[in-house]
């Protein structure tokens, strides 16, 4: 079964909000990956890059990690 994507071909709904949150907290992609690793999540800079550029789907664990790190709700992350 093929993986779902939006009518515009996007593979996730969080890329724009992830970029905005990362910039709001003055984090580079590498810095965000480092913070996530310190929190116990196995995400590197390449994962962040691929999510932000719509080249990758996002798992529920990754969404939880980002929500926890930025202290935002799931709904706020996918708006």
Question: What do these predicted regions represent?
Answer:
Residues 27-50:
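Short alpha-helical DNA-recognition segment
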Residues 1-25:
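A short, Lys/Arg-rich alpha-helix, primarily the initiator
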Residues 59-76:
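DNA major-groove recognition helix of helix-turn-helix/homeodomain DNA-binding modules
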Residues 24, 35, 69:
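Residues within the alpha-helical elements of helix-turn-helix
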Residues 19, 23, 37-38, 53:
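Residue-level detection of the helix-turn-helix DNA-binding "recognition helix"
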Residues 18, 29, 45, 60-63:
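Helix-turn-helix DNA-binding elements, focusing on the entry/boundary residues of the two helices
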């Amino acid at each position: 079964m093929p993986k779902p994507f939006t009518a515009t071909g996007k593979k996730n709904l969080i890329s724009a909000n992830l970029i905005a949150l990362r910039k709001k907290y003055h984090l580079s992609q590498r810095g965000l990956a480092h913070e996530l690793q310190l929190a116990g999540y196995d995400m590197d800079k390449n994962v962040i890059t691929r999510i932000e550029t719509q080249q990758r789907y996002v798992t529920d664990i990754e969404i939880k990690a980002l929500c926890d790190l930025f202290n935002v709700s799931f709904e706020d992350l996918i708006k």
